[in-house]
């Protein structure tokens, strides 16, 4: 039986070898820091390093490879703790930057590496995802057919957004971009959508206001807030949107629905320009490196509606970008407009005139969301967008003088009513029933001559009134169904009973 004993001994040895195998990052490749400064380290001695590879400087200090040269590599640091000097050893890990993901992040405020910022203790991670993950293949995607209610009447009626869409919010500084994005999060308070908000280089006071708004008006237990503070290492700002995308993908890949707000990609582009120039990459237009389009495209392509075979989950992205003096033809805005499925453009002039949200109807568009709009809302809107666009053009023309005829005056009065209806206060998102009711009332002339302030007063109790006095119709609307002709007549009659006495009292 010697052969049997020999075979048993060999199998035991093989099992022992397999047990001793480690699949963790390797730390036996060592390089040397040649130069260090501004959050960037120049390293030699790691000829086999790969882009985005995680490097360890010891004592909990890490960075990742961002640039590869013939005899050196550029490394972006991920933390400011400790000191790194020229001549220090650096080890390649053969791993990549990863973040904790899972339900344990819900209700938490974390940095881009998943470290807690809310004082609630360590995050309970179900697993870890690399910050850079491939976008879903075309065969694994499905058409955008389900609506995302943003709670902003001007968007849900004129430029609807669907689950799995990428819709850019762009405008000058302080025109309400973050307000619209946060309102979209608040509007998910009572549904099944997970919300992730990532702040990139924003002022601490601004981020604190967002956190407090979500805590008091939304459902913080279904939200993840990722904060990359401007005082942190540039590497944290750079990976922030990618890390937040990975956190949202966890839920999408399990058949759930997620909404990601990236605030904002203009600051991320500035960070990418900074670290790229410091690592020696040649500058291009507006000093941005040539790969800036690719960086943002590979990020936003990860947002998608998955097919039923992949679980049917969705990840909707609302990236924010800033313009200067309304210049949409600048490099970063044009890049993002071409990458995304539409854009909500906010106009400084409209904002200063008190039209809030200051959505510019002429240049805003949603390329795929129209198919996802709720059928009842689509039928209620009718020619609203066309009427409003014609009103804006006609109003500008009449400013040159002349006496408008009766027909023109009627068009101007009708357009003024639409404009007043579309005005909305901050952090007061509307539900589907309220939106359908307001649009129906406007389209049937029930709000003609009523000021925006009085419309908001009428709107405040409208939903509760309809649920009490037209419960059957209200239930049909909230379920997304289409009303019959008889139901439409009853609905308009109920609206008239509610609106007319209140409009008269307001007058």
From Swiss-Prot:
Enzymatic class: translocase
**Reaction it catalyzes:** ATP + H2O + 4 H(+)(in) = ADP + phosphate + 5 H(+)(out)
Annotated positions for site Required for activity: 364
The record, for Gene3D superfamilies, names:
2.40.30.20, ATP synthase alpha/beta chain, C-terminal domain, P-loop containing nucleotide triphosphate hydrolases
- Residues that hold ATP according to the record: 171-178
Record membrane topology:
Peripheral membrane protein
Q: What is its main location?
A: membrane
Q: Name one GO molecular function term.
A: ADP binding
SUPFAM superfamilies, from UniProt?
A: C-terminal domain of alpha and beta subunits of F1 ATP synthase, N-terminal domain of alpha and beta subunits of F1 ATP synthase, P-loop containing nucleoside triphosphate hydrolases
InterPro entries listed in its UniProt record: ATP_synth_asu-like_sf (IPR023366), ATP_synth_asu_C (IPR000793), ATP_synth_asu_C_sf (IPR038376), ATP_synth_F1_a_nt-bd_dom (IPR033732), ATP_synth_F1_asu (IPR005294), ATPase_a/bsu_AS (IPR020003), ATPase_F1/V1/A1_a/bsu_N (IPR004100), ATPase_F1/V1/A1_a/bsu_N_sf (IPR036121)
The protein's Enzyme Commission number: 7.1.2.2
A cellular component term from Gene Ontology for this protein is:
plasma membrane
Q: Which family does it belong to?
A: Belongs to the ATPase alpha/beta chains family.
Q: How does it assemble?
A: F-type ATPases have 2 components, CF(1) - the catalytic core - and CF(0) - the membrane proton channel. CF(1) has five subunits: alpha(3), beta(3), gamma(1), delta(1), epsilon(1). CF(0) has three main subunits: a(1), b(2) and c(9-12). The alpha and beta chains form an alternating ring which encloses part of the gamma chain. CF(1) is attached to CF(0) by a central stalk formed by the gamma and epsilon chains, while a peripheral stalk is formed by the delta and b chains.
Its biological purpose is as follows: Produces ATP from ADP in the presence of a proton gradient across the membrane. The alpha chain is a regulatory subunit.
What is the protein named?
ATP synthase subunit alpha 2
The organism encoding this protein is Gluconobacter oxydans (strain 621H) (Gluconobacter suboxydans)
């Amino acid at each position: 039986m010697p052969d049997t004993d020999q075979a048993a001994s060999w199998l035991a040895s093989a099992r022992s070898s397999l047990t001793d195998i480690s699949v963790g990052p390797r730390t036996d490749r060592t390089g040397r820091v040649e130069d260090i400064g501004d959050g960037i380290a120049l390293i030699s001695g790691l000829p086999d390093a790969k882009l985005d590879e995680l490097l360890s400087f010891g004592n909990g200090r890490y960075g990742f490879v961002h640039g590869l040269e013939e005899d050196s590599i550029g490394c972006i640091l991920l933390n400011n703790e400790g000191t790194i000097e020229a001549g220090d050893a650096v080890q390649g890990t053969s791993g990549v930057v990863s973040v904790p993901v899972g339900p344990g992040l819900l209700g938490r405020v974390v940095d881009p590496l998943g470290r807690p910022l809310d004082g609630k203790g360590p995050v309970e991670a179900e697993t870890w995802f690399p910050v850079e993950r491939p976008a879903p293949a075309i065969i694994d995607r499905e058409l955008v057919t389900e609506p995302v209610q943003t709670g902003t009447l001007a968007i849900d009626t004129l430029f609807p957004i669907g689950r799995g869409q990428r819709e850019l919010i762009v405008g000058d500084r302080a025109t309400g971009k973050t307000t619209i994005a946060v309102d979209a999060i608040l509007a998910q308070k009572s549904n099944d959508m997970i919300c992730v908000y990532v702040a990139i280089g924003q002022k601490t006071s601004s981020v604190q206001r967002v956190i407090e708004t979500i805590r008091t008006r939304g459902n913080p237990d279904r939200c993840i807030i990722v904060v990359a503070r401007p005082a942190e290492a540039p590497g944290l700002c750079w990976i922030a949107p990618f890390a937040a995308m990975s956190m949202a993908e966890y839920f999408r890949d399990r058949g759930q629905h997620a909404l990601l707000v990236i605030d904002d990609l203009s600051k991320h582009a500035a960070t990418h320009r900074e670290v790229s120039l410091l690592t020696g990459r040649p500058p291009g237009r507006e000093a941005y490196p040539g790969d800036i389009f690719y960086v943002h495209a590979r990020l936003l392509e990860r947002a998608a509606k998955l097919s039923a075979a992949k679980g049917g989950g969705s990840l909707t992205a609302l990236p924010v970008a800033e313009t200067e003096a309304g210049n949409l033809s600048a490099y970063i805005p044009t890049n993002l407009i071409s990458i995304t499925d539409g854009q909500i453009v906010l106009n400084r002039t409209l904002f200063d005139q008190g039209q809030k949200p200051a959505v510019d109807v002429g240049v805003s568009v949603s390329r795929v969301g129209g198919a996802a709009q709720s059928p009842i809302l689509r039928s209620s809107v009718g020619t609203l967008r066309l009427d409003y666009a014609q009103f804006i053009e006609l109003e500008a023309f009449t400013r040159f003088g002349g006496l408008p005829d009766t027909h023109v005056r009627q068009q101007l009065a009708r357009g003024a009513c639409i404009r007043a209806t579309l005005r909305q206060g901050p952090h007061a998102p509307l539900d589907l029933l309220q939106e359908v009711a307001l649009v129906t009332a406007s389209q049937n002339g029930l709000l003609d001559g009523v000021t925006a302030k009085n419309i908001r007063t009428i709107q405040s109790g409208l939903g509760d009134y309809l649920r009490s006095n037209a419960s059957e119709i209200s239930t049909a609307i909230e379920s997304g169904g289409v009303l019959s002709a008889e139901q439409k007549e009853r609905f308009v009659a109920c609206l008239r009973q509610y609106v007319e006495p209140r409009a008269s009292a307001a007058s």
